[in-house]
């Protein structure tokens, strides 16, 4: 997602607020952020394992700005349809983030984060990870995308990965990239 330069500057260690500043990639002390969260289980297979309080905790850990977010769990049919319609890819993917806030001066980050249960379960099994930890990782990943982070080039990917690892550590979740 493009945009959010102003918001990224708020995270920067550079006090000059230059537009080229990068977001902070370490979590030291983060102010509490306002969150309106809706969680939808169109596919309910993970609903018991992922209570809303746990989802909200992971979202808040990754949130640097006030936000209104919907997190929706879908099956592979809906996941594939959304990925095809919006990204031109004819397969289900683990997470899709639809950020609706392009204005750098927006007061609130607005986004829908779609998680495909089938893909999450397959990946967690293949990677020998807990489905809960894997899902929370991808929720954090989606929330970072909603706030303007991306992994389109190697530097941005490394920065986003480092930020994810720090956030997950604050939640007691091991580095998912090891």
Map each language-model feature to its residues.
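An acidic/histidine-cluster motif and surrounding catalytic segment
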Residues: 1-135, 146-178
